[in-house]
Amino acid sequence: MSLTLGVIGIDHRHIYGQLGQMLARGCSCKGWYTQGDPQPLAGFLQRFPDIPRASDPGTLLDDPEIDLILIADIPSRRADLAIKSMRAGKDVMTDKPGCTTLDQLAALRTCVAEMGRIWSVDFSERFEVPAVTRAAELIAEGAIGTVVQTVGLGPHRLNLPTRPDWFFDDAAYGGILTDIGSHQIDQFLYLTESDNADVVASAVGNFANPDHPGLQDFGEILLRSDKGSGYIRVDWYTPDALPTWGDGRLTILGTEGYIELRKYVDVTGREGTDHVILVNGDRCEHIDASGATLPYFDRLIQDVQNRTQTAMPQDHCFTVMELALRAQASATRLRGLANA
């Protein structure tokens, strides 16, 4: 038996992956609702033409057949929608960031505790990237010894003409560290097997978009836990010649070797995605990881059915967002920002 889904909020293209991955695993979708006519809606209708539009979100929340609500609304509205969904008896898979303030996070924690529902953030740079699955397998096999550091680089293409007004309002998107930085925090905690971490330093800035002072186009974080250290850099500087939206990379340093992931492109010329480079005492090789599985979605289906936490522990999800929010709040504000 699979799940019945509802979609609320189509303000980010990530909903394509959220819904598409679940439908590919046999789930069905009863309907969707979004405010207005956001830019990603046209692509959503092309991909999912047979799913009906609901007249209001309450229609989906009141439907007893719906098990799981998928959310990709404007980031600042996601927490409230998730809480309404959980109080209506639904589990939730939301796009990142799952919330934009510490007060929202506290309210989400309270709701999960009271309702016993699942609040899961689809950190797509792990959950939708086969290379990360393969890297985790290699680590589990002992290929690089004990992980002691990660360096996560998350460049993104700005695509300025396509961006809505909320994209330039840091109160709406939460800031660059809350938003795209949360991906990298998730991977650091996961790969180092850290339950928590300290934000040693963080910074945000606007170096290339003076006409949009609400946009943070650069951010960095230094994390440290009892298991290791992590450096994170995120930006909106992907140049036009790159054939994809970002040259996302992750280097995982172990005591007996290292792994480098070139997730979406290999600029040295290898075709395709999901390039894993492994170097240890016996091997120095490139691995095509494009055929690795994406277990998050299958496990989330099982978690909804069995009330388990195999896709992602709930505490991990909360901790990722808390660290992202704390890094954002304490970040040194570099040049070019409103109220810098």
Sequence positions of predicted segments:
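C-terminal helix-rich "cap/oligomerization" subdomain common to oxidoreductases
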Residues: 1, 7, 33, 68-70, ...
